[in-house]
Design a protein with these regions (language model features):
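Extracellular glycan-recognition regions
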Residues: 1-100
């Protein structure tokens, strides 16, 4: 989640923040977010995330990483937002795909 007021990108697990990094939101600019979940040896999963503005190139490195010991539940991918000071949120070009 991008938190404009706190100037952070946060990764949550069941409504609990597990990782965060500094990120400055730019009003009126599109924010791109990429999240990837991959299996690791030993029945673990790594969750990685990165964020960038439409005026920037996508970062090569992941900005957040967190290891999870519980396999993700199957189901539908979702995106949600929480308006900042009543500012509307628009989600466009949401893409989800399986990485083998």
């Amino acid at each position: 989640m991008v938190s404009p007021g706190q100037k952070k990108l946060k990764l949550f697990r069941n409504d609990v923040p597990v990782r965060e990094v500094v990120h400055t939101w730019v009003p009126g600019d599109w924010t791109h977010i990429a999240v990837q979940i991959r299996p690791m040896p030993g029945l673990k999963w790594i969750v990685m995330a990165k964020v960038w503005h439409s005026s920037e190139l996508e970062p090569k490195e992941w900005q957040l990483a967190w290891t999870e010991n519980v396999e993700p539940l199957p189901g539908r991918a979702t995106a949600w937002g929480q308006p900042f000071s009543g500012t509307p949120i628009a989600v466009d070009d949401l893409r989800v795909w399986r990485i083998d």
